[in-house]
């Protein structure tokens, strides 16, 4: 069957029975580029070629691994030694760390220079005239005021007094110290120190008076 007759039959210009399946068996000529012809083995996977290429580039994975350099960061960090925990000296760990500090702080805060303590009660020092008074009631406030007015430091012991009278005497002594520009300090429970304006008693001296016993100052 000619090509022209096939075209006519395709468009209905010729009866269908005039051609058979030969139309489908004939192949039209290729209108594009000529396709390359391949062998029958085209597309067939061959694992040997892949293994050979992989072995050439990375070494035989089925055997011994390739000799790769150790992993590391850029800049030479891999060459630096790894961090190791510090090994402490056992003698250093067992050494008391706060003993000397406590001794020094106690010596500096609570203790006083013995020479300074001796000078406090030498003749001519204002604290050498210190007086301890133990009033029984508020009526003895006059004696406290006179001693303080004369320039003598006064230790006022109110332990034997009831709270009401002790409070009144504390108010009186505080007002007296304020009026004469002195100082009024607590050295122990219900024990107070009245210091004239020309007598400067440091906190260390007040603590020392309370520790050594104010009963010694008569």
UniProtKB/Swiss-Prot annotation:
Subcellular locations according to the entry: Cytoplasm
Family, as annotated: Belongs to the SepF family.
Annotated GO CC locations: cytoplasm; plasma membrane
Region (Interaction with ftsZ): 115-203
Keywords: Cell cycle, Cell division, Cytoplasm, Septation
Keyword hit for Cell division: yes
Quaternary context: Homodimer. Interacts with FtsZ.
Protein name stated in the entry: Cell division protein SepF
Pfam families per UniProt: SepF
Major subcellular site: cytoplasm
GO BP annotations, alphabetical order: division septum assembly; FtsZ-dependent cytokinesis
Biased composition range(s): Basic and acidic residues: 36-65
Record-annotated membrane-spanning stretches: none
Function: Cell division protein that is part of the divisome complex and is recruited early to the Z-ring. Probably stimulates Z-ring formation, perhaps through the cross-linking of FtsZ protofilaments. Its function overlaps with FtsA.
Coiled-coil regions listed: none
Activity regulation comment: Inhibited by 1-{4-[2-hydroxy-3-(naphthalen-2-yloxy)propyl]-1,4-diazepan-1-yl}-3-(naphthalen-2-yloxy)propan-2-ol (also known as compound T0349); the binding of this compound blocks its interaction with FtsZ.
Span list, region Disordered: 20-81
Name of encoding gene: sepF
Disulfide bonds: none
């Amino acid at each position: 069957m000619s090509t022209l007759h096939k075209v006519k039959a395709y468009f209905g210009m010729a009866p269908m029975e005039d051609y058979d399946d030969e139309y489908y068996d004939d192949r039209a000529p290729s209108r594009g580029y000529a396709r390359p012809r391949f062998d029958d083995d085209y597309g067939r996977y061959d694992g040997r070629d892949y293994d050979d290429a992989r072995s050439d580039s990375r070494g035989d994975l089925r055997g011994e691994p390739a000799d790769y350099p150790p992993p590391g960061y850029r800049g030479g960090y891999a060459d630096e030694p790894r961090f190791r925990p510090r090994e402490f000296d056992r003698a250093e760990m067992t050494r008391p760390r706060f003993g000397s500090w406590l001794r020094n702080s106690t010596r500096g805060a609570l203790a006083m220079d013995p020479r300074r303590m001796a000078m406090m009660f030498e003749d001519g020092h204002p604290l050498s005239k210190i007086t301890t008074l133990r009033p029984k009631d508020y009526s003895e406030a006059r004696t406290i005021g006179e001693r303080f007015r004369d320039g003598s430091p006064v230790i006022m012991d109110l332990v034997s007094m009831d709270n009401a009278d002790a409070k009144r005497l504390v108010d009186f002594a505080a007002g007296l110290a304020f009026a004469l520009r002195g100082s009024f300090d607590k050295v122990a429970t219900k024990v107070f120190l009245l210091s004239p304006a020309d007598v400067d008693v440091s906190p260390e001296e007040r603590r020392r008076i309370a520790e050594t016993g104010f009963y010694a100052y008569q």
